[in-house]
Amino acid sequence: MKIKIQKIHPNALIPKYQTEGSSGFDLHAVEEVTIKPHSVGLVKIGICLSLEVGYELQVRTRSGLALNHQVMVLNSPGTVDNDYRGEIKVILANLSDKDFKVQVGDRIAQGVVQKTYKAEFIECEQLDETSRGSGGFGSTGVSKA
């Protein structure tokens, strides 16, 4: 798949896959940002893109940032719809107790292109029964002692 990219900032980098088997590509910051402890910050990527109809770009946390700095994409995965033409920006959350400094060119998130599907919603009076029923939030992962 070919994705058209428009650089709108002089520091913008065209995304690339780091290895043959990578499903995600790095997204790079175009400006310095300091995110205070237990706060969020918006990081500009400096590119706009055009995806084919039926696809989205998911913006995801880089595992190294999460493990080593306790920094994550707040709305992970963030969704960039195929009809969006504005600048890609990433909401980062700093869960640590110290400032997190983003430098120009830092790899701050990863993008993954995913196929999307349009559902048809059908109203009904009652849903089919399942063994889970209406159990939610932890209902299948914790043993009851």
Swiss-Prot record:
First-level EC class: hydrolase
One Pfam family cited in the UniProt record for this chain: dUTPase
Residue positions binding substrate: 62-64, 75, 79-81, 89
Cofactors that this protein relies on: Mg(2+)
Annotated EC: 3.6.1.23
Family to which this protein belongs: Belongs to the dUTPase family.
Protein name per UniProt: Deoxyuridine 5'-triphosphate nucleotidohydrolase
